[in-house]
A protein has these predicted regions:
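ATP-dependent adenylation/nucleotidyltransferase module used to activate substrates
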Residues: 2-147
Length: 147
């Protein structure tokens, strides 16, 4: 790892650093962006469903601010078509990190007649209205999303 070199009475240690991988560079950029947004915006939010993309986003946010807590809240637009295990994992991850989670429900919009089921059964396109209304009503001024 390092080699001690004697120069007069001082000892210097030379350390060889491994070159950064492409993944290291991407991670560093993501951490920088999280910190920059925290400094420039009043109320950022991370979209968080408990899926793989949002888990990576939360991991990067935690890395950006460790050992302090992540200074953002989380928002999930629940389609109503999620596996119960994913929602359970989502809730456990949020609790483990000590964060607050807001949930906007597509089903609630359908139940109150503001949205209508699609003939093909997919609800992904229906997430737009609950998402934009949650962003506006909760006054988020920056939004992080994965995938």
């Amino acid at each position: 790892m390092g080699a001690a070199v004697r120069k007069g009475t001082a000892v210097t240690t030379a350390v060889r650093l491994a070159p950064l991988t492409h993944l290291d560079v991407l991670e560093s950029e993501a951490v920088h962006i999280f910190r920059e947004v925290a400094g420039e915006f009043e109320k950022p939010v991370i979209l968080f469903s408990g899926g793989k993309d949002s888990i990576v986003m939360l991991h990067l946010a935690r890395k950006a601010f460790a050992p302090a807590p992540v200074p953002f809240v989380l928002l999930h637009v629940d389609t109503g078509h999620n596996f119960p295990e994913v929602l359970d994992y989502r809730d456990r991850a949020v609790a483990r990190c000590g964060l607050r989670l807001h949930v906007a429900s597509v089903q609630e919009y359908i139940d109150n007649g503001r949205l209508h089921e699609r003939p093909d059964g997919t609800r992904n396109p229906l997430q737009t209205v609950p998402l934009t209304e949650a962003i506006q009503s909760l006054k988020f001024d920056a939004v992080f999303g994965g995938g």
